[in-house]
Every structure is written in C-alpha cells, then in structure tokens.
C-alpha cells in the first residue's frame, strides 16, 4: 500500500507584532488603540467606523482584489504597489509606483501618486502613523501568504509517486486515476471555474533525491497549492516538517511511522488510522471482548523514538480505561533473542501481545512463541500484518486478531461502480485497490475542501475548511471527521479474526471508534 504524509509551499513566517497589528486593521478595521479609526465614504463624506469597512472586504484576505458589483478593487500587495513601471487601470487612470508617502496620501486623501482621484467606492481612512506603518508591514507579509499554484483559471495539485522500480505499477496507477478524476471535475466546470491540474514529483528510494524532486515541483514555475496522496515511506517525519514550514495543506492516506512531536502534523490531514491508532483499537478489544486486565497485555515494540512514543500512547490509552499498566518489551532487529523474549513473557504471565512497529514479522514472533509451547492472543495492527499471518502455527488458531482502518463493506455500491468506471477510463486494469481507493477518497475530500475554501483560495482557508469537515462520506471509506486538533479522518478501525484452518479473515463486530 502507498502510505504517506505531507506538503509544501512558500514559507509563511510567524507574524511580527507590527504585522499582527496590521492584519487586525486590514481584516477587522480595529487599530492599534483597540478601537476603530474613522473612515469617510462617497462624495458626501459619510463618516463610518473602519470596522464597518475593513480593507479585506473589497481587496480580499489575500490582498489581490476580486471584481464585485461593477467595481474591480486593485491588487494591493506591497510588491504590486511599488512596481517601478507603475500602473494602468481599466478606466485608463495611470500613475507611477507608490512609496510610503504616496501610500499615506492614497489611504487618507484618496489620491494616487499622479494626483488622480481614486474610485469613490474606496473609503478615505483617518489612520494614524502607527496604523499606517502596521498596515504597510502586513501588505508586505501578504506576499508570503500568496498561494502558489493558484491562477485565475487553474489550481495545481502536487503528489509524490514512485514511477520506477518495484512500486512503479502502483505509482503509475495512482497518477492515472488522479488524472482521470481531475478530468471529470474539469469537464463539470472545475472548482469555481478553475481547472485542477496534477503535478507529479518522482519518489526515489533515496530520501535526499525524493525531497529534492518534491522541492522542484513545489518551487518551479507556478508551484503547487497542495499535496494529495504523496508516497513518503521512509522519510515521513522530514516531509511533515517540510509541510509545516511551507504552510501547505496535505491530504494523505495513512501514516506508517508516527510523529509524536506536539503539533507536528498541523498541515497533514490523514484519511485513515495508522499503526498506533489501530493498536489502540486492539487494546480496547483485548480489554472489552477478551476480558483481559491491563497487566495481561504486553506491547512488543520496534526500536526507535517514534515507537517509544507510540507505545506510550497505547499504554496511556489502556490506563485510562482500566487499572494497572501493560507490559512493554523492546525488539531490536538482529539483536533481540526472540526465543528468550517469548520464554520471559510466558513466565511473566502475559496472555496477549500487541505488536507495534514493522520490524517484527508476526510469523517470526509466533514461531518463537510456538517453540516455547506458548500461544498468547496475538494482536496485530493491519500495517504490520505480513502475508504470512495466515500460516502461523496451528496453536494460534482462534487467537490471532488484526485491526484494519477500513473494509470492503464500507463501499457504497453506486460509488464503487463509479470508481471502477473511472479506472476503466484511465486504462487501469491491474490495480492495488487499497491504495487507489484511499487516493480516490482523498481526491473527493480535496475537492470538498477546495469548495469550502471559496473563490478567494488560500492555504489558510483550505486548512480551515478541512478542519470543519464532519462525517464526510466518500462512499468508499468510513466517514471522515476533522477539527482543530484532529488530523485522522476515520479515527478507529475494524477487528478481524484470522481463521488459520480456512485461511480467511472473519470481521468481528462493527466499526470501533476511538472518539
């Protein structure tokens, strides 16, 4: 399965005190004093508070201006105002570049640098010197917020996919499916008249090359507005940092390696639960259905700080719901004596084992346990369940449980047929369905978020739109819900039993939510 996280875009540094005050003035009309300065409107000079007529109302939160009601407010980002060759407006009004003094006169007296009167729709604001300085500082900052990859007629969406090597078939299938999906959206008029365009960066086995390839996609030409279904196996944490630093939203399937740093994933919206969340689902199952005490459960975790944090998260989850703490054992590939580990766990009275991390194959662990004639309940998050899980020693029959973030039963019949038709349109006859289903659902979520962000598209509006999504039905996955702190849409999973005799999975009960 293609697993991913991430994003990118120009850096949006934290606001300075002056920029923050300028933003408040620009968006709300409230000055440095905490009150609204006065504004005069129209030929009669009607006096109103600036809070009734903030700059953003006409020029937009991004400063670019949008035609409305027969009036076309200009782009007032500072780099536009100071263009050395000046400006020629639609009504043929001409003037040279603004400077600080010219800006003051335009805002307060309604005159451009050539002495021409501005449109009467433009209020004349009675701002003090500090308010003017703060406003000018924020207009400079708007350049940093400008959304790359967005034009009047297009939005460029990036992805990172393997196009060569053993994963090439999966990567090419995702690319073909996304291109076909975007073509459908565009044929229906796009999003607020903008066409969706896919920009593909090539994932390489080498992390440095992959990051470099992604950087070119983000920075070359128009760049990209957001990332969709990126493949980031092996360097998720680094790409998550890139996403946050560049202030760009990302819609990703599922993260394999957890990132336990506070607010690390502020811009990454995962569709499905990963290994840590699914381990919590299994922990609940062990306690509620298998009726085990916390002390009966042992977490066998892979080595590494990410898995230390994951084990702490699962332990804390168990402790909130019951008495005592589960056991924890560290597995180091090539160093740990599994037979000795199994013997000690049995001697300690462990009745259930939750595997946490991809270093330890469940079949290898089960073989070591069987050599000790020990058959505990074996609980495996889906991302860590190898194909050999069906071939465990017979003593484990009825004792192996796997948690998955979604099942085929989540698929609405009509949506599934529509999805299959899209694959046919794209010429995809062999496909890793789990990967493509997640990418298709991600594209549906992306389009919904773009619609919610509105015509004045910005990364900030996109993130806010995603955070407000509640119970979104893609038709192929469990409902997706986000908020200001939640970055996993379908937070929970299904538990399935492994029938070793018949070599099949048997779902046990409904979706298990972690809300």
Kindly give the residue locations of the regions a language model identified:
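Electrostatic cytochrome c docking/interface patches
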Residues: 12-49, 92
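Extracellular/periplasmic periplasmic-binding protein-like sensory domains
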Residues: 368-440, 505-514
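Solvent-exposed, acidic/polar segments of extracytosolic/periplasmic ligand-binding ectodomains
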Residues: 470-515
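C-terminal capping alpha-helices of c-type cytochrome domains
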Residues: 15-21, 98-113, 120-148
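Extracytoplasmic ligand/sensor domains, especially the bilobed periplasmic-binding protein
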Residues: 224-327, 377-401
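Beta-alpha junction/loop-to-helix N-cap segments that form part of ligand/metal-binding clefts
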Residues: 152-154, 169-176, 190-262, 333-338, ...
């Amino acid at each position: 399965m293609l697993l991913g996280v991430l994003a990118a875009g120009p850096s949006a540094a934290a606001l300075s005190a002056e920029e923050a005050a300028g933003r408040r003035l620009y968006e709300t009309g409230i000055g440095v004093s905490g009150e609204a300065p006065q504004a005069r409107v129209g030929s009669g000079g009607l006096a109103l508070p600036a809070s009734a007529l903030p700059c953003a109302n006409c020029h937009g939160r991004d400063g670019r201006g949008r035609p409305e009601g027969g009036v076309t407010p200009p782009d007032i980002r500072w780099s536009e105002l100071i263009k050395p060759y000046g400006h020629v407006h639609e009504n043929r009004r001409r003037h040279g570049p603004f400077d600080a003094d010219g800006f003051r006169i335009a805002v307060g007296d309604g005159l451009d640098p050539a002495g021409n009167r501005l449109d009467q729709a433009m209020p004349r604001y009675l701002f003090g010197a500090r308010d003017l300085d703060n406003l000018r500082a924020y207009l400079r900052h708007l350049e940093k917020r400008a959304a790359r990859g967005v034009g009047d007629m297009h939005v460029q969406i990036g992805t990172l996919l393997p196009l060569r090597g053993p994963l090439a078939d999966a990567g090419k299938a995702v690319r073909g499916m996304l291109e076909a999906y975007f073509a459908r959206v565009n044929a229906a008029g796009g999003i607020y008249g903008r066409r969706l365009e896919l920009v593909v960066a090539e994932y390489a086995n080498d992390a440095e090359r992959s990051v470099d390839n992604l950087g070119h996609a983000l920075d070359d030409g128009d760049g990209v507005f957001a990332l969709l279904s990126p493949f980031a196996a092996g360097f998720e944490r680094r790409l998550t940092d890139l996403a946050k630093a560049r202030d760009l939203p990302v819609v990703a399937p599922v993260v394999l390696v957890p990132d336990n740093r506070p607010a690390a994933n502020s811009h990454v919206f995962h569709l499905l639960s990963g290994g840590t969340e699914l381990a919590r689902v299994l922990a609940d199952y062990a306690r509620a259905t298998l009726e085990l005490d916390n002390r009966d459960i042992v977490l066998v975790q892979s080595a590494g700080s990410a898995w230390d944090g994951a084990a702490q998260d699962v332990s804390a989850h168990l402790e909130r719901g019951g008495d005592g703490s589960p056991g924890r054992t560290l597995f180091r590939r090539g160093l740990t004596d599994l037979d000795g580990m199994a013997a000690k766990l049995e001697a300690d009275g462990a009745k259930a084992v939750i595997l946490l991390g991809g270093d330890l194959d469940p079949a290898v662990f089960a073989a070591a346990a069987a050599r000790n004639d020990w058959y505990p309940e074996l609980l495996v998050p889906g991302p860590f369940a190898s194909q050999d899980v069906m071939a465990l020693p017979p003593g484990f029959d009825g004792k192996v449980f796997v948690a998955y973030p979604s099942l085929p039963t989540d698929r609405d019949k009509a949506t599934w047929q529509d999805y299959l038709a899209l694959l046919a349109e794209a010429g995809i006859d062999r496909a890793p369905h789990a990967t493509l289903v997640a990418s298709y659902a991600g594209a549906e979520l992306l389009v919904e978020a773009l619609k919610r962000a509105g015509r004045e598209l910005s990364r900030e509006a996109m993130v806010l739109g995603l955070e407000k999504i509640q119970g979104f039905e893609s038709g192929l996955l469990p409902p997706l819900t986000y908020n200001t702190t939640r970055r996993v849409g379908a937070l929970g999973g299904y538990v399935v039993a492994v029938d070793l005799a018949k070599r099949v999975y048997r779902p046990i009960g409904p979706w298990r939510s972690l809300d």
